[in-house]
Curated annotation (Swiss-Prot):
Homodimer. This is Ditrans,polycis-undecaprenyl-diphosphate synthase ((2E,6E)-farnesyl-diphosphate specific). Catalyzes the sequential condensation of isopentenyl diphosphate (IPP) with (2E,6E)-farnesyl diphosphate (E,E-FPP) to yield (2Z,6Z,10Z,14Z,18Z,22Z,26Z,30Z,34E,38E)-undecaprenyl diphosphate (di-trans,octa-cis-UPP). UPP is the precursor of glycosyl carrier lipid in the biosynthesis of bacterial cell wall polysaccharide components such as peptidoglycan and lipopolysaccharide. Its cofactor is Mg(2+).
């Protein structure tokens, strides 16, 4: 490592995480699935804090996919209540730490109460200049691309653009998170090795890190390990976890 600036520049700018394994972790403890989801919130706190210390620009957490509605009705209901509780209890802490919260996905299917909480949380943190935290809720990569295609088709029909004007850049500008760097590191917990319809366009060139840890077990050290792997894979710097941790106190 030539200098700390080169090291800092080698960090991922946008980390996406598929937080998998809450239910299996709970089952291994002889607990109901919702117990795992609640413990998963602690892992979110630790991971967000660690990423912010590192100076990561954006983090996107896959909280609830558009396919998750197929889960048992009771579990979905409990997840929605947990979402409301977390938004209510955590948003002031995020705001205090200058973090910006966004919820991406089709929120129209959520209850009015949850939609209101989302709007309040986004409005409170909208002017913050620290790390952007995207919560992907009722989100799917195919949905994201479809919505962009519909928006462009409408503009073409209205004469605002020509069909021949449509290119990759224009599509990118009509996706969610268009103002953020593309994902350069995807982390998925629980040992599963697939992307599950998550940010299909934005992860075109991402490095993908799969760990056997269940999400409730994921913590600061887990993130440091993933980031160290990314730096060594992407930049061939031969850095260590200790060097990554040192950055947390230097930011």
């Amino acid at each position: 490592m030539q200098n700390s600036q080169a090291f800092s520049d080698s960090l991922p700018k946008h980390i996406a995480i598929i937080m998998d394994g809450n239910g299996r972790w709970a089952k291994s403890k002889g607990k109901p699935r919702v117990f795992g989801h609640k413990k998963g919130v602690n892992a979110v706190r630790k991971t967000v804090a660690a990423a912010s210390k590192l100076g990561i620009k954006a983090m996107t957490l896959f909280a609830f996919s558009s396919e998750n509605w197929r889960r048992p009705e009771e579990e979905v209901g409990l997840l929605m209540e947990l979402f409301i509780t977390v938004l209510s209890s955590e948003v002031k802490k995020l705001h205090k730490n200058n973090l910006q919260l966004r919820v991406i996905g089709d929120t129209s299917r959520f209850s009015e109460r949850l939609q209101k909480k989302i709007v309040e949380a986004e409005n409170l943190t909208a002017s913050n200049t620290g790390m952007v935290i995207n919560i992907a809720a009722n989100y799917g990569g195919k949905w994201d691309i479809t919505e962009a295609a519909k928006a462009l088709a409408l503009k073409a029909r209205n004469g605002e653009i020509r069909v021949e004007d449509i290119n990759e850049q224009l599509i990118t500008e009509h996706l969610t998170m268009a103002d953020l760097p593309e994902v350069d590191l995807l982390i998925r917990t629980s040992g599963e090795c697939r992307i599950s319809n998550f940010m299909l366009w934005q992860m075109a060139y991402a490095e993908m890190y799969f760990t056997p840890e269940f999400w409730p077990e994921f913590d600061e050290d887990s993130l440091v390990e993933a980031v160290t792997w990314f730096i060594n894979r992407e930049r061939r710097f031969g850095c260590t976890g200790e060097q990554v941790k040192a950055l947390m106190t230097a930011q």
